[in-house]
Amino acid sequence: MSQSFDFRGKTALVTGASSGIGRAFAYALAERGARLLLVARSRDKLRDLAAELRRDHACDADFLTVDLSAADAVDTIDRHLKETGTFVDVLINNAGFAAYGRFETIPLTRQRDEVLVNCVAALELTHLLLPGMQARSGGAVINVASTAAFQPDPYMAVYGATKAFLLSFSEAVWAENRHRGIRVVALCPGATQTAFFDVVGAKEAAVGVPMPVANVVRDALWALDRNLSYRVVGARNRLLANLQRLLSRQMSARLVEKILRPREDPDFAATDLKA
């Protein structure tokens, strides 16, 4: 039986920290005694969040404004860590977004950015920070994937592929490090109470009843305490994820296409959905 992960005195880097699941992670880790480095694009939101955490939890909270789709994003973070003498013990790769629409209608630049933010940033940050965790014989990485990782996702084709990457990547890195004191979890939430589906509408996209972000984060930390390699959030979502194993890939894709298809003409304009 694994011991609960102790965040006291540890430094956690949280990407996409300005809102939604990332913000909820920041509060949860502050409550558990972690120091925080908050990363996102919105300086004002990060500044306000850091101030709230210091006020409410007497937390050591720093922030760094970075666009993770930029070529030098991880270099910028690395430089900040070296300049401040910061050693990261916990990495929360939460930043991400989805471009919603028929694949060919979505600008290629947006889909490339989707891969950069959802996949490449997580890969590069893990590659940057994992050796330090190994040297200190302890640490944790939580990669925020999605239930979209378990099947093809028409109208969010690239998004689903990026989340499948995160799931497979996380499980592999977990296996490589399971005896080295490092825990790696792929967190797979379904619909969540964030702005993610505001444009589409939960009813239109048939994504189910959104779950509070606090519940998602609580499930993530529960999985981390048990050294699980992945965690699907919610009993209904776990059932649906397992049902995919009983269907052919073609059948799964056809069913999800019907669920995610918009009511209007299928040649609808593409829309970005922020995580």
Language model segments and positions:
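Residue(s) in the substrate-gating loop at a strand-loop-helix junction
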Residues: 146
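Conserved glycine-rich Rossmann-like NAD(P)H-binding loop of the short-chain dehydrogenase/reductase
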Residues: 34-49
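Conserved NAD(P)H cofactor-binding loop of Rossmann-fold oxidoreductase domains
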Residues: 94-99
